[in-house]
């Protein structure tokens, strides 16, 4: 509601000066109290108040220190006095709103604000968490929780952004808890699953431990103290608490409050309702005057002037309806006047309607409660002391009640009787009885009676009343002590005896009993009643009358002091016997008539006070004190003549200042009590909604610009209201838009747009760690609303995106600048060594990644609301990395040639970028690749050359000794070194084997050179793999090159091993003394390892998967076949040597004849060793020991089996061929014995070594077995001594040779 004197009115078109009361002295700027140190600065200098002082520009700052500069002392004192007067006047209006609200209520659905944290509490929290991390608390926790707390402590609690947020008052304990909860949710999700323990349980446990650390041990013992006013401000406040709050807000002293409280009669609801009626009547009159004189505020269209008057009338009518809807009494279903709810109240709601609602006598029927308490009877002498007496009581027209019985010697009761009546002047009868003792007596005997005529003004205390006794009674002085208490209904505003004379009613001057009845909030009636009557004898509605004190009227007998009620065409004269009674009647009727004129009794008449002198003296005392303190002008000031737009601006500002300095993290939201008072003030005093929200926006923006945390949702509400109003959407039903409102709205819109853009540019610092929750998302939403041209047309997303993109570009510069300042990177870049520069850039990269991860974690909330937000955040990150590029390139350019220390930087950055879908292969990522492609290629080239050289030199010096522990025997080959990061790079380990090396040597006894080769190839491939090169083509090229390199290197290794194997075997002898040397087994194992490693090192994923792998596989397989063949050939040559020796015993040879003769001759005298047994035994030992050597030292079972298969088969073939050459000859006994033993032992030994039955029992073996069996049979017949137990038959008793 825009008051005629509001700030929307231009000074040159305002109402005349005499129509308003002036609060501001001429030439003095309107200013707020000194407590509001920012008021003058916040008010727009162009604000024009439609009254005196309203158009004066306000000073830059009202603080005394600033004001005192260039101002003399009298001017300064005048300003301070003016501020005090403004505060007091405001407080008068505020306490009236609190005392009798009829428009607003304290909202109960507002979100409860959390207690804010201060710097001392933050420091205490840091100490508590540090104590936990140092193990100084009793809280038991696992390592994972400790790591989470350590991260929270280092990243969050120690952050300067958190310190600033706490200092601004926008941080609560709940914010700290939510940040910790968000951190641990991510950690717990990454933990492995544990049977029987859900992750929700872990989360709950961690939160409970966090709460225990947060509270601290000493806080558990503290008892809560009494809550202060600041602490209960979030609750629904009582009137006393609201008074106290606004005393603090407006700087009002207790004494000033008490004086105003008494003077305003804040505890008198009738006076407050009457004050409201007077205010509303004054506003209607002012609206009519404005319409008549055609003096309006400037509106954006001429048609709005008439609409403005209608809005003023409608707003007052609404307030009247609100007031009318309030019940007259607090309750009581017996009150029958509620039917006049004024559905037909057009008489007083609509201007110009002279029709009145005529009340009937039945409309003003009252209801009273009477309490009659009978205490005792005195002077009872006519009956015996032991007789029973009792009393009855009745209100005429109602039921009778009786007391208990008592003895005549002690007639005391203390009995109370409760009655209800509708008679304002009831008749109460109390009778005293004694029980009749006569047999025929039908009724008890009446001893006395008393008839009383109480009123609501009668004494409530017990009094003695003389009783009327029957004739001839001895009780001449019979008295009864009783109390009659008659209540005063809430709608009965005053009552008593008055003389009256009127033209239409009470046409005869006489004394009557009058009652002032309030039928509804706007309908009062003056009624005269007779005894025992419910309806008034006569009544007069007070609507339209004006009451005032008058001088005595000559000729009217009765009454000492006079007053009258005057209305056009009617005058009613009243008279009272008592001055104080007259004052009370005039005050009551003054409230009822709603007149603006306040009656003041004549000075001389105040001296006439035959009764109630003490009451008048008290009133005079209050008036004197009030006058002494200069309060009268504030009470008597007409609200409709003051600039409430200006006053409300000060009130709202002071309230917001107080709110932001209380103990709650309010973010700019008022407390329920403050909202209630501001709502009530605006409704009651006609503050336009747009003006209220424009002022609120100004204040909130001012605080936000000064570092306070303000909820953007709050800004959005007020801005949306103002935008809707300015564009004619009538959010509060007001269709008029003033020029000033539109201009101020445009100014605020531009200022708000700049503020929001600045906040988005500083989002890491305005919304640290995503606090307040949802604030960034709300800010983006508000910015979108602010950028709209009007309220109906949505702005294209591209335009919003363009603005936000510009903000995020600034944000990238701001964030990176602050990060480099924190890391002090510029000093390092200017002076440090290349290694130090690289170290600093690596640290800076870690900080950059941390910043962007925090952005994603805490500021990605716009993702749900704005589809373009992730893209812009990615562009922001690219800008951020572009700034980092300058420092990175500087550091890399300073590195010496062929220095690989920069690879960890690539791995760090690449691992972050490749996992971000929006940054992967982005501008910075590609720049990073362009820098490191030559380094990677150069590194691989040098590694290839170094490995090739190590193979060449290694095989030249190779001893082929098996390597048991690679860490102790690898040669120290000079290779390009890469510092280790979390990744394994191709370096020679210094006497400690990496964990992944275990598979290379646990079952491997390869050579030093081969093991070194395989380790280097694997490490190089792991290094390149761990680079996770993002560009597929180059990554495939690297992989292909490394696979080809591995294939070539392994091929060279295999060929060198094959050559060395052949040379080694050539040097070995062919006798049964041959034992396979360890070097041969090592060579064998090298081929085995090459086979295994080729699968991993030479296999490609993709179309060429088999290209290198199959080639090297074929080479290895063929080489293995060759060396098996060479080894078998060597073993067979030993067997051939044995058979060659046996050939000397062939039948018909000279040596055979001599040998047979000598053996036979010698056998007669000595125990001659069995010829041929030494030869068989040495061969069998040769086979067995070489089998054991191969089985022990060659690691591949498959190759061993192949070797044994071929060895067995070839051995059997050689023996079979040897026998085939002697088909026509009978074997010598020694030949036969030796062969049988060799064949049988060979068969059994190879069967034990796992040679399969099919191979063992081949055709060759069958042929051999049959031949030897036949030879054995022939020998047993021809030789007398036989074969001495040697036979081809299987036998367990057979001698083991």
Curated annotation (Swiss-Prot):
Disulfide bonds: none annotated. It is a peripheral membrane protein. GO terms for cellular component: centrosome; ciliary basal body; cilium; cytoplasmic vesicle; cytoplasmic vesicle membrane; glutamatergic synapse; nucleoplasm; parallel fiber to Purkinje cell synapse. Residues 1-19 have a biased composition (Acidic residues). Residues 756-1075 are annotated as: Interaction with DRD2. InterPro entries: C2_dom (IPR000008), CAPS (IPR033227), MUN_dom (IPR010439), Munc13_1 (IPR014770), PH-like_dom_sf (IPR011993), PH_domain (IPR001849). Residues 353-468 form the C2 domain. The modification Phosphoserine is found at residues 61, 1291. It comes from the Eukaryota. Residues 296-404 form the DM10 domain. It is found in: Cytoplasmic vesicle membrane; Synapse; Cell projection, Cilium; Cytoplasm, Cytoskeleton, Cilium basal body. GO terms for molecular function: lipid binding; metal ion binding. Residues 886-1057 form the MHD1 domain. Residues 1-78, 1275-1297 are annotated as: Disordered. Pfam families: C2_CAPS, MUN, PH. Residues 47-56 have a biased composition (Gly residues). Calcium-binding protein involved in exocytosis of vesicles filled with neurotransmitters and neuropeptides. Probably acts upstream of fusion in the biogenesis or maintenance of mature secretory vesicles. Regulates neurotrophin release from granule cells leading to regulate cell differentiation and survival during cerebellar development. May specifically mediate the Ca(2+)-dependent exocytosis of large dense-core vesicles (DCVs) and other dense-core vesicles. The PH domain is essential for regulated exocytosis and binds phospholipids. This is Calcium-dependent secretion activator 2. It comes from Mus musculus (Mouse).
